[in-house]
Amino acid sequence: MIIKRDNSLSKIDLRDWIWTPFFNDLVDKLSVFEIEPYPVSHDFLSKESITGSRRNPVHVTTLTWAAKFEKIKQVRLACIKGGESLSVFNLLIHPLNDYDLPFFGADFVTLPNGHLLALDLQPALKLDNIHTENVWPRLIPLHDHWQSLLPSGGEIPKEAEPYFSPGFLWSRLPLSKESDNIISEILRPAFGEYLSLYIELLHIAKPLKKERALKILEGQKAYINYRSTKDPARAMLCRFYGKEWTEDYIHKVLFNI
């Protein structure tokens, strides 16, 4: 079945997609803003492929939901579903550089060997106290509470440290009914609280002077360059859709400065 979508705000409807409640929460919380479709080429709104073997083919679907509104350059969500063992919710909220705001990032991935769960308000300028002073004192208590209820995901690479906050929520879970319960009863409310905090920060953010806005832009460029260069989904997407489509998707949709 080919999924047709009119624009980037068309509903995400993937059968048995574990992250549907998270998508619904996102749309509900963003309803307080006057959101508009973010321009996304039709080739990236919906893409399908068949992988696996001839005896056991697997249908893979990738859908993109994207919006823009006041203070936000882009909200984009990459949604992937492939059989029983592949399910992806990859969300990035990219603020305009006219405001001292972090990125909002959520990357929830289900693979055959388990769930990888990452959630953060990611700084554009981690070492800049002005950029972080209104965020971290409110974010860290949320992190400490929810991380105490989740197993740690382990160390993050040194090169990635500048792009994560002390409030980085990071966990790995095996595929099990217990993990499904953890996702619905712990991860989902954690996602809601992180997103609510981000929305509060949006409401109070004030426009910056030009010099400061340019400094934020440089930090955003470094972040986007790192994310686009190191995107762990690149190999998987290349396997499904080919290198040309994948590189265009990464640079024109997922991480577009």
Curated annotation (Swiss-Prot):
EC number: 1.3.7.3
Enzyme class at the top of the EC tree: oxidoreductase
Keywords: Oxidoreductase
Gene Ontology MF term list: cobalt ion binding; phycoerythrobilin:ferredoxin oxidoreductase activity
Family matches, as InterPro entries: Ferredoxin-dep_bilin_Rdtase, Phycoerythrobilin_Fdx_Rdtase
Signal peptide from the UniProt entry: none
Similarity comment text for this entry: Belongs to the HY2 family.
Entry function: Catalyzes the two-electron reduction of the C2 and C3(1) diene system of 15,16-dihydrobiliverdin.
Name this protein carries in UniProt: Phycoerythrobilin:ferredoxin oxidoreductase
Classification of source organism: Bacteria, Bacillati, Cyanobacteriota, Cyanophyceae, Synechococcales
Alphabetical GO biological process terms: phytochromobilin biosynthetic process
Pfam families: Fe_bilin_red
Catalytic activities: (3Z)-phycoerythrobilin + oxidized 2[4Fe-4S]-[ferredoxin] = 15,16-dihydrobiliverdin + reduced 2[4Fe-4S]-[ferredoxin] + 2 H(+)
